[in-house]
UniProtKB/Swiss-Prot annotation:
This is Probable nucleoredoxin 1-2. Residues 1-165, 178-322, 328-488 form the Thioredoxin domain. It comes from Oryza sativa subsp. japonica (Rice). CDD domains: C1, TryX_like_TryX_NRX. Keywords: NAD, Oxidoreductase, Repeat. Belongs to the nucleoredoxin family.
Amino acid sequence: MADATHAAADGGVATILASADGRDFLLRNSADKVKISSIKASTVALYFSASWCPPCRRFTPKLIEAYNELVSQGKSFEVVFVSGDSDQDAFNAYFAKMPWLAVPFSDSEALAKLNERYKVMGIPHLVILDAKSGEIYTEDGVELVHEYGTEAYPFTTERINELKEQEKAAKDNQTIHSLFGTPTRDYLITNKGDKVPISDLEGKYVGLCFVVNGYGPVVQFTSVLAKIYEKLKAVGEKFEVVMVSLDGDEESFNESFADMPWLAIPQGDKMCEKLARYFELSGLPMLVLIGPDGKTLNDDIADIIDEHGPDAWEGFPFSAEKLEILAEKAKAKAESQTLESLLVTGDLDFVLGKDGAKVPVSELVGKTVLLYFSAKWCPPCRAFLPKLVNEYNKIKEKHNDFEIVFISSDREQSSYDEFFSGMPWLALPLGDERKQQLSKIFKITGIPSLVAIGPDGKTVTKDAKTPLVAHGADAFPFTEEKLQELEKEKEKKINDMAKGWPEKLKHDLHDHELVLTRCTTYGCDGCDEMGDSWSYRCKECDFDLHPKCALEEKGDVEMGEENAEAAPAGYVCEGDVCRKV
């Protein structure tokens, strides 16, 4: 560290970091004691962190990088670790990686007082102080290090405002070089390692594609974007894509970049984080469109790509006029929809029967087909399956021109195989590329979902599950006319069926009183199957029982699976559906 004014012995950090029992030192990870009065830094950061905290473990390397860079630049800066670990060994192992000072773990009173003084409600937490006066520069040190890195030093309000002004000026004067270049780098790279001058992008439309290796939505998005990219190249459009990797290591970067046909900012370049901040990245996938003049045309066209898939190239360069044309084409495509246009992609012109037999899609043409989006890991899907199997068999007894195709969201072949083994219908193979496109066409955001396709290949309804649960096999063929007819009949039956049922009751499966409630579909917390129309419900606990289950003499209905699979990342299960988040 560079020399700076000593912290005052009777104020500032000298007072803040000392203990009531006279301790006047901090520790290095070598166990050496450092007099607090000897700290020469003018800016001191208190780092509240703990080894058991995953966000802390992710942030600590970033703070170490910033600290080392500031020290190497001769900046007057110090960090003091304030541990939230539960034992000395955990403290020692975590502190061993840190190049700065720490309050002794044994001084639990001082640690508690610091947490109380700065009202620490969560970690990691970085409070940055004027060492001499103890004045708080900021309590948002974690966010500032994430956003600005060492440029935020000395973390004063004046410096942060200055950086914001610089960002505004940069946006006002944005060029392709200011976006992608640095004082020491005027090139991008290919996945072969070749350097391509940034000047080659002048006069072109450029997409900035933010990428994280292995993240499902990004992997799916970039596979579609690659098709659009190749098509635009083939028709001679001046279009380029630049990958902006948010991965922290070279292996992940290389794995992401290996199959991409476009350019990238080199791995580890700080410009990647700057661009994420510059364009206020809040979610992935994200694709920013830059015009031929280097100005931003659209902050994010990922939704356009997501909605139209590979056909989105026809909307390039995604102006209002082009998007209107694209929407018209999408409408016309929907109107000309056939079962084969939905289920046939290149050589993928089949679905799977039992024992892996390939059934040509052509054999399904002219039938009413339900597309069943589901997964074994999803509790509502497991609860719905017995009902669906039962009604499927009833429909097939009367109507041979009917079929279901299972479209799985499972991640493992074993789970897929086990779940499919209990289904008497057909399926797409696990991981089939048609699943992604069908999910987009029908905007599937939760499972289980049932989409009904009529004999003419047109969509009858995107929600066949609700009428099937309500009316069973009688809902076939799921047309609006049929459902209106059934609703009239059902309304009368519903009112008649509840005659004689108690309005309220107590049941062994729940502590609170259950109230007879008119409702739509729900999952019974007694037998784990679907129900509708009437439930004995506890609104306070969101607890439901079928009237049949509730009115049994004993509350010994078998409860749900104890060892159910957990939902994978990106899904949350609530009630009778698992949704993407």
